[in-house]
Each structure stands twice: as structure tokens, then as C-alpha cells.
């Protein structure tokens, strides 16, 4: 029997197109609703409560659940390239709470707080949708093909980085000798180095060497471990620059004249964080 209340269920509020156009997703992880677009539903009451749960936000499980709920075409948000993340979260925010958003920012020089209204549709339009370039030419006969970082990869990297930073603080504040601290710091540094290299290895799809295409993970891992630092820097710089595609631009804030007279700049840029509960707070 069909629920007689189903006509009151939430319906798609907007549709979005992804910066990646659906590339780099795992098989079966994405189903477009119409012509390379995805429908976005408003958040449910449960979704809003999830986005205000600090524990769930810490490991990104709240964000994953909300994306599954509001953008059901993304069947596996963990495999979503981070390039698409800002577009998806902006879409959920607009569908749920509207196109405008009030934020508070601290004005440089005078250190005073002002409120500012952001047009999220404009921010969506300003997102860089340039095509991801997967190729890094290291030498005329050596080219590395990379992929965007996935949301799972980003989350794991953030959690592991946070854990190492927390350990640095604990060691610095701990009651141990200087030599013991140096030993602990060296171990933490080694783990951070391995974390960076592991992240790079995960981002490499294949390597073309003298016309031979190598996709074997073991060979790729050995190459990353043994290549010269200049090559590693080139790969890392390329991946970082390409992963920045799809990001929202900082907000340009106009400063009130009275604050400018006190020494504040006429305008300044302010970043807007999307992947946290503040972005999804409903006005009371």
C-alpha cells in the first residue's frame, strides 16, 4: 500500500553538475539523474542533527550520511573525488536552507567582528570547473598518471595527521628527558613522512616508462620509495594543484567606512569552510 502522505515527502530542490562530470568514481558509485546532473534533496531533521554531532563530524560519517540522503545519485560518497565535494555541500546547503548565508568575520587591523551575507549561488558559479589533468611528465620518457584524491583518502589523511599532531603536543608537554623527546619526535617525523609517501602512492594510477605502461602497485610503490626528491616534489605539487580544482573561492568582504578610518583595509578575503556543522546551522 502506498503511504497516503508520500506527496508531502521532501522532493528535489535543485540539481547540480559536478566539476569532474562523473570521472574518477568507482564503478557503480554514481548515477546521474538527468544529462550529467544530480538531484539534491533538502536535509531531513535527522540529517540536520547528524551535522551537529561533533563525534560524527570528526570522522566524516555525518557528511557521508547526509550526502547519501540528500544526493542519492552519489551511491558511494567515500569514493567521490574531493574536487566535487564543495559543489555537493553547497548544493545541500542551498536545497536545505536557501541561497543566502549570514557569516561573521573578524576585520584585519581593527580586530572587530562584522556580519556579512553570502550568495551561495554566486559562489557555486565561481567554482573552478577546469578539467583535471592526470599527467605529470617527469622526463621525456617518463610520465606518471595520477587521480584526484577521494573523500575517503582525504578523511584518512586528516585523521592520521591530526593524530600525529596530537602526539607532538603530548611529547612536547610530557615529562621526559631531551634525548627521549628527540627520539619520539624522530619517530613522529618518520610516520609523517610515510604518510605523505603513502598518500602519493595511492594517487598514482600508472607510470609510462619508455612506452611501457606499469600499473602494478608493487612496482609503483618501489618507484615512489626510490625516486629522487625532485621527482617526488613535482608529483606532489601537481597533485595538490589539481586537487584544488572545484574549491570555492574566498569571500571578498567589503569593510564599513568607519573601520577603514580606523586603519582596516577596504576589502579583504575570508575563506568559508563547508565541511562542518556551522555551515548547516538553521537560523532560530
Predicted regions and their residues:
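Long C-terminal interaction/binding lobes of large macromolecular proteins
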Residues: 1-284
Amino acid at each position: 500500500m502506498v503511504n497516503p502522505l508520500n506527496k508531502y515527502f521532501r522532493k528535489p530542490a535543485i540539481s547540480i553538475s559536478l566539476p569532474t562530470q562523473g570521472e574518477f568514481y568507482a564503478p557503480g558509485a554514481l548515477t546521474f539523474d538527468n544529462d550529467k546532473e544530480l538531484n539534491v534533496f533538502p536535509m531531513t531533521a535527522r540529517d540536520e542533527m547528524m551535522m551537529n554531532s561533533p563525534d560524527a563530524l570528526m570522522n566524516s560519517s555525518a557528511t557521508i550520511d547526509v550526502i547519501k540522503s540528500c544526493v542519492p545519485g552519489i551511491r558511494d560518497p567515500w569514493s567521490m573525488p574531493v574536487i566535487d565535494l564543495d559543489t555537493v555541500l553547497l548544493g545541500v546547503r542551498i536545497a536545505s536552507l536557501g541561497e543566502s548565508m549570514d557569516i561573521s568575520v573578524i576585520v584585519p587591523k581593527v580586530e572587530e567582528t562584522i556580519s556579512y551575507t553570502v550568495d551561495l549561488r554566486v559562489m557555486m558559479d565561481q567554482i573552478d570547473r577546469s578539467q583535471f589533468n592526470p599527467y605529470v611528465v617527469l622526463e621525456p620518457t617518463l610520465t606518471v598518471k595520477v587521480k584526484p584524491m577521494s573523500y575517503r583518502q582525504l578523511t584518512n589523511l586528516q585523521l592520521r595527521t591530526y593524530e600525529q599532531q596530537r602526539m607532538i603536543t603530548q611529547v612536547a608537554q610530557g615529562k621526559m628527558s631531551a634525548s627521549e623527546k628527540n627520539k619520539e619526535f624522530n619517530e613522529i617525523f618518520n610516520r609523517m613522512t610515510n604518510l605523505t609517501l603513502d598518500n602519493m602512492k595511492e594517487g598514482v594510477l600508472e607510470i609510462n616508462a619508455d612506452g611501457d605502461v606499469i600499473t602494478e602497485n608493487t612496482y609503483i610503490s618501489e618507484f615512489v620509495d626510490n625516486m629522487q626528491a625532485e621527482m617526488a616534489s613535482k608529483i606532489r605539487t601537481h597533485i595538490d594543484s589539481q586537487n584544488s580544482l572545484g574549491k570555492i573561492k574566498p569571500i571578498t568582504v567589503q569593510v564599513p567606512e568607519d573601520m577603514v578610518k580606523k586603519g582596516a583595509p577596504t576589502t579583504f578575503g575570508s575563506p568559508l569552510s563547508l565541511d562542518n556543522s556551522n555551515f548547516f546551522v538553521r537560523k532560530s
